[in-house]
């Protein structure tokens, strides 16, 4: 039995879970998310707990068991608390500013780089070098934050670029001088 998959999921007050065949919908204070459960996995609801079960011990069923349980738990946490990734920009002249719901980055290129917010994602600019990406879908928040970081990855020699808050950059030693 999957150690993660066998744990029951408690549904907090104010969250409505709807099972419709293989589609599970979670509705909460922050919004609504839905997910299609893969075929061998079954989800059952008893009052305020959800249980994820698998019919057999095939490799595919075992791997989907823990995954499905975690995805449903992430959906419930997303509609109650939401998710947030903080990013910081390091480098002379590197900055970010909000243009409506979009962001405009100056990252040392010859042109400003614009990033528009996908549906369900909000950007909060906390200063010229700090921003946060927030939303209810954990995967989408992580993907948008990773795409922003990809615009200018941290340089291993000077550490300049876009990084996650608290991320430690492995530094390299430059070439030896005379």
From Swiss-Prot:
Q: Which PROSITE patterns match?
A: RIBOSOMAL_L6_1
Annotated keywords: Ribonucleoprotein, Ribosomal protein, RNA-binding, rRNA-binding
Q: Which SUPFAM superfamilies match?
A: Ribosomal protein L6 (SSF56053)
> Gene3D superfamilies this protein is in?
Ribosomal protein L6, alpha-beta domain (3.90.930.12)
Can the keyword ATP-binding be found in this entry's annotation?
A: no
Q: Which GO terms describe its molecular function?
A: rRNA binding; structural constituent of ribosome
What Gene Ontology cellular-component terms does the record carry?
Answer: cytosolic large ribosomal subunit
The UniProt entry's GO biological process terms, in alphabetical order, are: cytoplasmic translation
Q: Which family does it belong to?
A: Belongs to the universal ribosomal protein uL6 family.
- Which NCBIfam families does this UniProt record tie to the protein? L6_bact (TIGR03654)
Function, as annotated, reads: This protein binds to the 23S rRNA, and is important in its secondary structure. It is located near the subunit interface in the base of the L7/L12 stalk, and near the tRNA binding site of the peptidyltransferase center.
Quaternary structure and partners? Part of the 50S ribosomal subunit.
Q: What is this protein called?
A: Large ribosomal subunit protein uL6
Q: Which organism is it from?
A: Paenarthrobacter aurescens (strain TC1)
């Amino acid at each position: 039995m999957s150690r993660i998959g066998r744990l029951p999921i408690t549904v907090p007050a104010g969250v409505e879970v709807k099972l419709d065949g293989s589609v599970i919908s979670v509705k909460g204070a922050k919004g609504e998310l839905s997910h299609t459960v893969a075929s061998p996995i079954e989800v059952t609801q008893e009052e305020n707990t959800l249980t994820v079960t698998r019919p057999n011990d095939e490799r595919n069923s075992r791997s989907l068991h823990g995954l499905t349980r975690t995805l449903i738990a992430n959906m419930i946490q997303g509609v109650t608390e939401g998710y947030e990734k903080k990013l910081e920009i390091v480098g002379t002249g590197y900055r970010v500013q909000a243009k409506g719901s979009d962001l405009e980055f100056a990252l040392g290129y010859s042109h400003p780089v614009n990033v528009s917010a996908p549906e369900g994602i909000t950007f909060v600019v906390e200063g010229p070098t700090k921003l946060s990406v927030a939303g209810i879908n954990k995967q989408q928040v992580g993907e948008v934050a990773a795409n922003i970081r990809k615009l200018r990855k941290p340089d291993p020699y000077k550490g300049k670029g876009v990084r996650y808050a608290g991320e430690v950059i492995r530094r390299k030693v430059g070439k030896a001088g005379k």
